[in-house]
Amino acid sequence: MTDKKLPFNKAQMEKIIEKFPTPFHIYDEKDIRHRARALRQAFSWNEGYKEYYAVKACPNPIIMSILRDEGCGMDCSSYAELMLCEAIGVVGDGIMFSSNDTPAKDFEYARRLNATINLDDITHIEFLKEHGG
């Protein structure tokens, strides 16, 4: 396990707290990029491998943009997540749409974005043909 260190010291943190109301989140862009590159490198033996970030984990367009820039696709499961992807310029095979109990409008939007649609239930095939196919 690697040592995890904050990218700032106590004095810097106190200045941040003075400026921004709490609670808030701080993300370390340098570390996010480093880890995305390390993951891509770990699977470099697998030609065509692409990591897909689960947007539902943190639907933050800044984080999503960083990961997009590092070659990650976006794993979406809702209309709102598809909208975020479109807003940051991720379309086509940059989106893996995996959803259960999915409204027709979500499948239709995923198709308009030319997303890859991942089905985990054979009974969804006919519904997809009717609404997104």
Language-model-detected regions and their locations in the chain:
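A charged N-terminal "starter" segment
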Residues: M1-I117, I122-G132
